[in-house]
A protein has these predicted regions:
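Terminal-appendage/accessory-domain detector
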Residues: 61-71, 78-260
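Glycine-rich, mobile lid/loop segments that gate access to catalytic sites or pores
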Residues: 1-71, 75, 87-94
Length: 260
């Protein structure tokens, strides 16, 4: 829920995934409300990490963090079934996740839950990725596909400026201040969150593949490196407004403007 937003406070979003998995397992097992409640609190407490795992010199932690909180969720259910309780109240308590880690007043938080047996609003508002790259970079790949039809010789390009919303700029773009996002030695976990890399490769190839687009041979091509270094991102107020001010998740503008 954006009403308990982890990202602005540099907390990894798997902090939501752990409790969500726990709730799902509890529902599948038809457990009673109190057992699920305690399991969710236990899971929430063991699923909070900083976003450093997604910044700087990345390791396989980024890839396996969802699996870890999934394991924590199973453990939480198992312990709750056996009578163990979680830290309570884990979110809104005086020393809980919200006041200590998220720095928000408890009374300002509103959580919209689906009606019983009603549509699962959280799932239905999810933006599904078409390409195997960062959430905020999918539209950039599509833009590269469109632009490559209009550019006769990529070697003549002097500069590429990408204007988009804040998250694209600071999470995947040059606004992250991560030099690794420009490095041909960077890991796949880094490059799938480099708007500069994915735009350059998509512009050259005209397709995106979940493995070959990140291979050592692909990322170390000299022509690609030259093009890659010419790409820079910028935060754009218009895209910010059309993304952050839109209440309907499926109507949020995900795109960008590209100047070549």
């Amino acid at each position: 829920s954006m009403s308990i937003a982890l990202n602005p406070n540099k907390i990894d979003h798997v902090g939501h995934l752990g409790p969500a998995i726990t709730g799902g397992i509890g529902a599948m097992l038809n457990l009673d409300e109190e057992t699920i409640y305690q399991a969710i609190q236990y899971s929430a407490h063991t699923s909070i990490f900083t976003r450093q795992g997604r910044k700087g010199d990345l390791s396989s932690w980024k890839a396996f963090a969802p699996g870890l909180v999934g394991r924590n969720a199973i453990d939480a259910i198992d312990r709750a079934i056996r009578g163990e309780k979680g830290p309570s109240p884990v979110w809104e308590g005086d020393y809980g996740i919200v006041p200590i880690l998220l720095h928000k007043e408890n009374e300002n938080i509103e959580i919209n839950l689906p009606e019983k047996n009603g549509p699962r609003s959280g799932i239905l508002s999810t933006f599904t990725k078409e390409h195997s790259a960062g959430y905020h970079g999918n539209s950039i790949i599509d833009l590269a596909f469109l632009l490559r039809e209009k550019i006769k010789d990529l070697k003549e390009i002097k500069k590429i400026n990408i204007y988009s919303k804040k998250y694209t700029h600071i999470v995947m773009g040059s606004g992250s201040n991560d030099p690794e996002k420009y490095s041909p030695e960077a890991s796949r976990e880094t490059l799938d969150h480099s708007a500069m890399y994915i735009f350059a490769v998509a512009l050259e190839d005209g397709f995106w593949h979940h493995e070959t687009s990140y291979s050592k041979e692909r990322k170390q091509k000299q022509e690609t490196i030259k093009l890659w270094k010419k790409v820079e991102t910028f935060e754009d107020s218009d895209f910010n407004q059309r993304y952050y001010n839109e209440k309907d998740p499926l109507k949020k503008v995900q795109g960008a403007k590209v100047e070549v």
